[in-house]
């Protein structure tokens, strides 16, 4: 009897062992099909912690206000080959080295197939002006595109539509990054679209992806690429309360999906707090250029009246000497 029970138990054990090693029909089918279980979230891909690096967290430059120049455009500023280029909402202008206006295009949308009424911050590269163009009204934009102008004639040469796949809903600024053959764009809107920088091919204008800003500045107005970094102007100060706007920066790392954002400069030395706009770097003189407006009240990105004592909005470019280190 004991021998029979022992044989029975041994048989049950062997059956369980073999059953545990065998795959079920469903599992065999899944393995044969080559399906792999997807694991979310993905492993952390950020190398290093910016908050623990004094070199990364502190400003890259010290700034000293050198000059202030009144210009005719309220949106953007760019330096190229000794000349200064200024964008208004509906104009493009060129200034010589002495800040004298030498040429204006008052009809920059002529020849475009889509409706446009707004140019943001601009950049100039290889004899061409790059501009983000759109139709903008009361905080909402449509018909976003990249417009490329001849820097000599100020006439449009070609345009590229902004990718719907990108999710970008407004374009406030643009900059050329020759090191990676890229064109970068930013969004002013204070929502999901404003939390990214958008990358396009400098060659054919094709969309190359977007990069998450962590943490994103509020109301981004302009960007400029300089020496591996993108500098960002943010209209995050409330002018009615005398709060200053700011410049931020992030390192370009195409292997990452996100860019960590650091504070670079508080603009507490402008004539009067108002609305920061475009940004550029005079690479010849080692100076940062900041476009700034004062005198008008801004609601949803639109001029809605003037402050007391002003008969019109004043557009100025603040020129800062840049000194490496802290």
Question: Where are the regions that the model predicts?
Answer:
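Short coil/turn segments that connect the beta-strands within blades of beta-propeller domains
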Residues: 81-82, 126-127, 179-181, 227-228, ...
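Loop/turn-rich, solvent-exposed surfaces of beta-rich toroidal or solenoidal domains
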Residues: 215-256
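Repeated scaffold domains used in trafficking and secretory/extracellular systems
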Residues: 71-78, 113-123, 165-176, 216-224, ...
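A short helix->beta-strand "capping" segment at the edge of beta-propeller domains
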Residues: 44-71, 261-263
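Structural motif
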Residues: 91-96, 138-147, 192-199, 239-251, ...
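Beta-strand-rich domains and repeat architectures in extracellular enzymes and scaffolds
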Residues: 63-90, 118
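Blade-loop segments of beta-propeller domains
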Residues: 101-136
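Beta-propeller domains
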Residues: 42-53, 85-112
